[in-house]
Amino acid sequence: MDLHKMQYFKDVYELNSFTKAANKNFVYQSAVTQQIASIEKELGVLLFEREHGKIVHTQAGKIFYQECRDILDEYEHVMEEIKNHSSYKVQTQKKLKIGF
């Protein structure tokens, strides 16, 4: 499982829509649906129940959401911490010398 899958799941959960989650992530709805199905297969549980065009969170989905949210928040925190340490920054400036 990777962070992209977790982000897709989190967005579907919060937006209650595969389509809205896909739009938020600039991908096709079918891609999000496939990723959620992949997570469900990997975990061996349903995270959402599909009822008459609506999605309902399962108990497993609620638990997984809380964990995904925490993991994604921690990832963002770590990335910000690392970026804020100037001693670790990659030097990207290059000099261009023009001779006549």
Residue ranges, per PLM feature:
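The N-cap/first-turn positions of alpha helices
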Residues: 2-5, 29, 61, 95
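Short helix-boundary/capping micro-motifs
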Residues: 12-28
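Interdomain hinge and pocket-entrance segments immediately C-terminal to HTH DNA-binding domains
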Residues: 84-100
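Hydrophobic two-helix hairpin corresponding to the core of helix-turn-helix DNA-binding domains
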Residues: 9, 21-22, 58-61
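Alpha-helical linker/hinge and terminal dimerization helices associated
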Residues: 42-43, 64-89
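Residue cluster at the C-terminal edge of the helix-turn-helix DNA-binding motif
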Residues: 15, 24, 38-46
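A short LG(V/I)-centered, amphipathic sequence patch enriched
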Residues: 40-57, 80
